[in-house]
Each structure stands twice: as C-alpha cells, then as structure tokens.
Swiss-Prot record:
The gene is E7. This is Protein E7. Homodimer. Homooligomer. Interacts with host RB1; this interaction induces dissociation of RB1-E2F1 complex thereby disrupting RB1 activity. Interacts with host EP300; this interaction represses EP300 transcriptional activity. Interacts with protein E2; this interaction inhibits E7 oncogenic activity. Interacts with host TMEM173/STING; this interaction impairs the ability of TMEM173/STING to sense cytosolic DNA and promote the production of type I interferon (IFN-alpha and IFN-beta). The E7 terminal domain is an intrinsically disordered domain, whose flexibility and conformational transitions confer target adaptability to the oncoprotein. It allows adaptation to a variety of protein targets and exposes the PEST degradation sequence that regulates its turnover in the cell. It is found in: Host cytoplasm; Host nucleus. It comes from Human papillomavirus type 49.
Length: 103
C-alpha cells in the first residue's frame, strides 16, 4: 500500500482452501455391544473376586489364620473395616478356651 488511501490494486486476496477435514469417525456401534459389556461388568460385580485374607487370632495366641472369600470390591472393603475395628477371628484352640470359660 502506497499512500494514505487504499485502492483496489493494493488489496491482494490470497485465499487457499486446504483439504476439507473429515469429522466422521466411521465407527460401527451396535446397540447390543454396550449393553453386552454392561452385563459382563455386572456379572463380575455380582460373582465377585476371590480373595485370601490372612489375620491373626483375636484370642491372644497370635496364630495366623487364612480365610478365602469371594467378594465384590465394596464387600471386601467393608470386610476389611470390620477386621480392623470390631470383628476378630479365633483359632480352634482359643475358641475352646473362650467357650469353656478359660478352663
């Protein structure tokens, strides 16, 4: 641009159109697939996951006790809270002692 006023020859438009962007993902989703996945996830939650729990005897002898359970994630967390707070396992010897009044 030369001067104070703009003239038409001073304006040069250079428009270049690139390739159009294809926004389609072309995924083939069926209505059954998500429902099927949800059912499988629900079955896993209902069936649970096998856990091995190792705890010490609450009767005082300190014996290690193993318990095998099948539980969901929420159930095993609740079980863990019970073991840490108010639930204690007993070995057979301590159970007999407590049952017989310590005799």
């Amino acid at each position: 641009m030369i001067g104070k006023e703009v003239t038409i020859p001073d304006i040069i438009l250079q428009e270049e159109f690139g390739q159009p962007i294809d926004l389609q993902c072309y995924e083939n989703l069926t209505a059954e697939a998500p429902a099927e996945q949800e059912l499988e996830a629900e079955e896993e939650l209902i069936q649970g996951i096998p856990y091995k729990v190792i705890a010490t005897c609450g009767g005082g002898c300190g014996a290690r006790l193993r318990v095998f359970v099948l539980a969901t994630d929420a159930a095993i967390r609740s079980f863990q809270e019970l073991l840490l707070e108010e639930l204690q396992f007993l070995c057979p010897q301590c159970r007999e002692e407590i049952r017989n009044g310590g005799r």
